[in-house]
């Protein structure tokens, strides 16, 4: 048994090494009509964004609201020629707008430099099988502490924000507001709105800088995150597979951990380079997980996708390119 486990570990380690090296030697592959090339029936695509992503004319975009969230900033940066943005209270509601046809796209947080994967939003993506990842936008995150007019740091007894905002500002708060309690909110902008409505000098919010002006709050401290390199990745979702030739694919797998080595070996063999892997318990039994797997290739074909989705319990969830907003 010990030798068998050692052998599996060796195979997995070798596969990871091959995956990391494959970016320098991936084969050229044909474009895929199934995965990353234009789908039949899409005739209303007219606007091309800076990422090469083609956007439906008069597109509507749902996002985690209210106004003033980082998700709104990401959505407006990605969809620079779109005017119809729909703020929703939760990510589930934002995705539901796309599924119901009320929105063409949804933008949801995916991963942060400091807070890691945004697990509840990844869970929402795992649950919904009717949407695909068609784009990604990365923006810098500069968390700001804000309170009502006249408030000072000495007044603050409670700091509210989204869970990610609380995590990203924890070190700063430990040093500057060590006795202040935490209050988790649905979003950073919801926290700013809550503080504004409370008119309470003892409550502050950690939110995007623009939220202070939007909700009439006073900036108490800037850049309260741990590092200036703080970034968040956001997925762009649609009911239709990406009509452009993305170089990154995402798969969602439901399996036990000991099946991962086979999947990773097949990724490398198909010409992919493993980029990220997030795991979430599937709620059925110990040791059984849902995995969100991202992999890159110079181009992506039907055969490459099929090589991965031949495994039971693994599905293709889209391909995309990304754009990044500079600080």
Question: Where do the language-model regions lie?
Answer:
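Domain-level signature for soluble enzymes in the chorismate/prephenate branch of the shikimate pathway
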Residues: 2, 10-14, 18-327
């Amino acid at each position: 048994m010990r030798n068998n486990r050692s052998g599996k570990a060796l195979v997995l380690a070798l596969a990871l090494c091959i995956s990391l090296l494959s970016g320098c030697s991936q084969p050229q592959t044909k474009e895929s009509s199934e995965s990353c090339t234009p789908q039949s029936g899409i005739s209303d695509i007219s606007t091309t964004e800076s990422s090469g992503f083609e956007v439906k004319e008069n597109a509507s975009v749902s996002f985690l609201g209210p106004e003033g969230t980082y998700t709104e900033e990401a959505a407006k940066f990605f969809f620079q020629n779109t005017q119809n943005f729909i703020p929703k209270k939760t990510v589930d509601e934002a995705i539901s707008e796309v599924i119901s046809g009320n929105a063409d796209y949804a933008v949801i947080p995916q991963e942060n430099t400091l807070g890691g994967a945004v697990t509840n939003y990844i869970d929402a993506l795992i649950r919904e099988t009717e949407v695909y990842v068609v784009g990604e936008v990365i923006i810098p995150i500069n968390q700001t502490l804000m309170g009502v007019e006249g408030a000072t740091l000495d007044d603050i007894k409670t700091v509210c924000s989204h869970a990610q905002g609380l995590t990203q500002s924890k070190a700063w708060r430990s040093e500057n507001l060590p006795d202040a309690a935490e209050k988790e909110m649905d979003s950073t902008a919801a926290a700013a709105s809550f503080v504004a409505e409370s008119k309470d000098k003892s409550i502050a919010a950690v939110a995007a800088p623009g939220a202070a002006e939007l909700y009439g709050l006073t900036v108490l401290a800037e850049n309260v995150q741990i590092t200036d390199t703080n970034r968040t990745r956001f997925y762009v979702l649609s009911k239709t597979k990406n009509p452009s030739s993305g170089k990154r694919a995402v798969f969602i797998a439901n399996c036990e951990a000991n099946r991962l080595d086979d999947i990773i070996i097949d990724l490398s063999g198909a010409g992919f380079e493993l980029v990220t892997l997030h795991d979430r318990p599937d709620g059925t039994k110990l040791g059984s997980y849902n995995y969100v797997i991202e992999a890159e290739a110079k181009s992506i074909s039907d055969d490459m996708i099929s090589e991965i989705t031949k495994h039971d319990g693994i599905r293709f969830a889209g391909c995309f390119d990304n754009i990044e907003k500079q600080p």
